[in-house]
Amino acid sequence: MSDQRSIFDVHGPVQRHDTKDGSTTLFSENFQQYYHNPNGALSESELVFFSSNGLNQRIQASNGPIHIFEMGFGTGLNFLLAAHKMIEADNSHALHFYSVEAYPITSELANGFTYPITWAKPELNTWLPEVFSGLNQGWNTFQPDPSWPIYLHLYVGYLKEIQTQMKLNHPIDYYFHDAFSVEQNPECWTDDVFMSYHNWGHAESILSTYAAASRIRAAMAAADWKVFKAPGALGKREMTLACHPNSKAQPVNLTPCPNERLKNRWFGGEWN
């Protein structure tokens, strides 16, 4: 392991860590947290952001463009995995992947990442170092391979900076909420954040996160999301999925959270 300081990072170094499934993650010394589950970065990403929310089936169906918004670009694994799945499925529709990252890592650090996967295109191995090598504050847009309609729209800065000015050509289909925990990063887990998601999406949008605390579920419910418990990844008992109250995409095999009670607890000031 070696410390690497980000070009924008004022929060101290990060360390490379090999997780138990053979994939790379990082450990933030400032937040005192891993970027992914140390039991398996790739495995966690697959379950939380592609399997549990039905995105794998949507990609395989190849029935239109897909728009994803991610809070916390981190190592870029979720973008890389989404691109891989689109190419592997020979899905010729566009993928627009929006993400926010306040403290991007260096391209040198990204160049050392390893994953136990055979990428759909070998060039995928070079995409992340290329992304991290050319970042500016604000919006950065990349099309890593002109032969595929795969676009990364990466905002370097804080989510609050774009909440009131976000302009999209198409509503968001899937939300990947992958910020550091509510204990370490509470500003990313408020009803205001989840209301922005609500406004940027559509009736069938789906929100997924690795977290399961009552506080974050209450914030979602307060923003008019219908919240569900889902089995957690790699030793975690639960994770969280959410959809619009009248969505046709409501998961039928999951347990709904007590949404009204959570909403009342939030507005009652339990976490203020």
Q: Residue spans of the language-model regions?
A:
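Conserved beta-strand signature within the Rossmann-like core of class I S-adenosyl-L-methionine
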Residues: Y174-H177, A203-A211
